[in-house]
Regions:
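Catalytic nucleophile-loop/oxyanion-hole region of alpha/beta-hydrolase
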Residues: 148-152, 170-205
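Serine-hydrolase catalytic core
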Residues: 263-274
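N-terminal targeting or regulatory segments adjacent to alpha/beta-hydrolase or S9 domains
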Residues: 2-9, 21-116
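Short amphipathic alpha-helix adjacent to the substrate-entry channel of hydrolases
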Residues: 150-168
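A short loop-to-beta-strand scaffold at the N-terminal edge of the catalytic core in hydrolase folds
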Residues: 115-127, 134-135
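Hydrophobic core
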Residues: 11, 15-19
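Short beta-strand element of the alpha/beta-hydrolase
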Residues: 133-142
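Primarily recognizes the serine-hydrolase "nucleophile elbow" in alpha/beta-hydrolase
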Residues: 189-260
Length: 274
């Protein structure tokens, strides 16, 4: 091989190496979500998809996605929440584009392998602009069917983030996956995950706030009780408890819940307390 051929070969290798980062670069979306963005456009945003943020707040069945995909965010979310909801999704996009891990599994891979329903329990992370402060954990409602991580969760997260807090939004098991006190267990494990990784999340582990809505409000109220809540994990007790229109009366649902999700059990369940 002559000198010229050797130089050409070296240059070719260098050129290929220089192109590798571009070839393997993660596709990023633009933070351009508005109330007029359709749900299909929102869900196909590369950064929303890549982040793993769960946006199916109204679809009980997969086929319902076909109905909602061409509806706008303004049609999907409540009018009083839609602006903050859009900004929350833009914040998710910005965080993802900046290398932030948005979605965190609450349970270990081994636990999820043994019980796949645990894979649906997740935290969505909104880091504060200034690290080292207190955090808020948002527990959205679920209509006893599907949870509202994007609508109630996202809109509350955006407002709290603007106040300077690090915010986590909890996706917990619901409806037929809610047996054996699953939603309460998910909340406990979520706080445990944050507490054990406080340095990684750059938050203070104590005096956190629980910001809860509807059925999530019921879970937050139970979790604030040491005997049946936070003391079982163990984690620090909440410093602040904000319950917005909490669901507090299972009088007409206890029998249905027992039959559907906990048939035959006589042990305490989260929906039998009130």
């Amino acid at each position: 091989m002559n000198k010229r051929s050797l130089i050409a070969g070296v240059l070719s290798v260098c050129l290929m190496l220089a192109m590798l980062p571009a070839a393997f670069a993660v596709e990023q979306g633009e933070a351009n979500i508005t109330p007029q963005t359709t749900m299909k456009e929102l869900r196909e945003n590369p950064s929303i998809k890549g982040s793993g943020y769960y946006t199916y707040c109204r679809e009980m069945l997969p086929i319902e996605s076909l109905y909602w995909q061409n509806k706008t965010l303004a049609q999907y979310a409540k009018p009083e929440l839609v602006e903050d909801c859009a900004q929350a999704m833009n914040l998710v996009i910005e965080n993802y584009n900046n290398g932030v891990q948005v979605t965190w599994q609450i349970y270990t891979p081994e636990e999820i392998e043994a019980n796949p329903s645990l894979g649906g329990a997740q935290l969505f992370y909104y880091p504060a602009s200034t690290p080292g402060g207190k955090y808020a954990l948002v527990v959205p409602g679920n209509g006893n069917g599907v949870t509202s991580e994007m609508e109630e969760g996202g809109s509350a997260a955006y407002q709290l983030h603007e106040m300077g807090y690090t915010v986590f939004v909890l996706r917990y098991r619901s409806f037929l996956a809610a047996s054996d006190n699953a939603p309460l267990q998910d909340l406990g494990r979520a706080v445990q995950l944050i507490t054990e990784n406080a340095d990684k999340f750059q938050v203070q582990s104590e005096n956190y706030a629980l910001v809860c809505f509807s059925a999530g409000g019921q879970l937050g109220g139970l979790f604030a009780n040491r005997e049946i809540g936070y003391g079982n994990y163990p984690v620090p007790k909440p410093g602040v408890l904000l319950l917005s229109y909490p669901f507090v009366d299972f009088t007409y649902g206890k029998l249905a819940y027992h039959v559907l999700i906990d048939p035959g059990t006589r042990e305490w369940r989260y929906y039998t307390t009130i």
